[in-house]
Amino acid sequence: MELPFGGSKGALIIDPNAWNKKELEKITRRFTSELAKRNLIHPSQNVPAPDMGTDENVMAWISDEYRRLNPTEIDALACVTGKPISMGGVYGRIEATGRGVFYAIKEFLKYSKDYKRIGFTCELSDKRIVIQGFGNVGYHAASLLAEHGAKIITVIEKNGSVVDENGIDIEKLKKYFNRKKTFEGYDGFTKTRNRFLTKDCDILIPAATESVIHKGNAKNIKAKLIVEAGNGPVTAEADRILIRKGVIIIPDFYANAGGVVVSYFEWVKNLSKMRYGLMQEREEEKKQSQLVDALELMTGNNFPKHLRTEVVKGSTEIDLVRSGLEEKMREGYKKIHEKYHSDKKIKDFRTAAMVIAVKKIADAYKYLGI
């Protein structure tokens, strides 16, 4: 993804639902303290980001505890990402991974060499999609895909699933889920869960835990395209089975990279101490307004009011973050596509992406003389 933002993985083995908010805060602050003791959290060393079981509150506690331990650190806000806006977060971080998944699918459907391999058209509107997971990633991916015409026919969660062959109303389901904390009682609810991974559909998006597609169910997968929105949802054995079946898999380290891309944007914002758009928003508005005035003068017609507001508006932080994310997802997909089609030895997108990554590391070692 061409981000100077490498890092590591770490976790606390607890169930957040088993602890109240005060207890979670205490646990998080102690965890931050232990990381700091080992020099494992620092704006220039290791910058944690949100993952399963965390939210803006958790990231805010980490940030505040780090600043308490390092009161003179000028870049302290950049020690962690996924923070609330009021604590140095960036607009668009919550939706970032799900939006990145949406952009990945959009890119796939731009390349006829890719989508024609599995009998797809370039249209999103005729695609039937099954999504496993309805957290930040699953919800935002589902919402954007539905907004652009795709049919979300099944959403799978840990307590059951919702099925509607005509397409689920994602926003209505989200409101219900937020209120009830379960799908139970919603139209189309069933207690069946992972069996729906093998449901007849065009696109399958596993957006939850690891290894949900394995050698035991891979042969029954009917989706032609799998987009790995979660980390490691397809085991190595399942991967081989699916490739032999002709299924295309868009790998996790590209498909779900939207989160780390926007975390990088947040980190840069914190280091620069300025929000995105601050230096250009009003200048853009002025220039666009002058352009609209010139068009009205030249044509003798008034620009429609509802269009004028949209055209004249300068780029806000959320506009720039979404634009930057889309560009990074475009760049990433293009590289994978080109590598896959340029080397007959490469049989799948995952291998193509790995070859690109390993070559970058090899080149770095070569030029550094290591």
Walk through the language-model features, giving the residues of each.
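Conserved active-site and cofactor/substrate-binding residues in soluble primary-metabolism enzymes
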Residues: W19-R30, G53-N57, W61, G92, ...
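Structural motif
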Residues: P4, A11, N39, Q45-N46, ...
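N-terminal ligand-binding/catalytic initiation module
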Residues: M1-Y91, E95, F102-A104, R275, ...
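Rossmann-like adenosine-cofactor binding region
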Residues: G160-I249, Y254-A255
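Flexible, glycine/charged-enriched surface loops at secondary-structure junctions
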Residues: E2-P4, L40-A49, E73-A76, K113-R128, ...
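Glycine-rich phosphate/diphosphate-binding loop of Rossmann-like nucleotide-binding domains
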Residues: M87-D200
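Adenosine-phosphate binding glycine-rich loop
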Residues: F108-L109, K224-I370
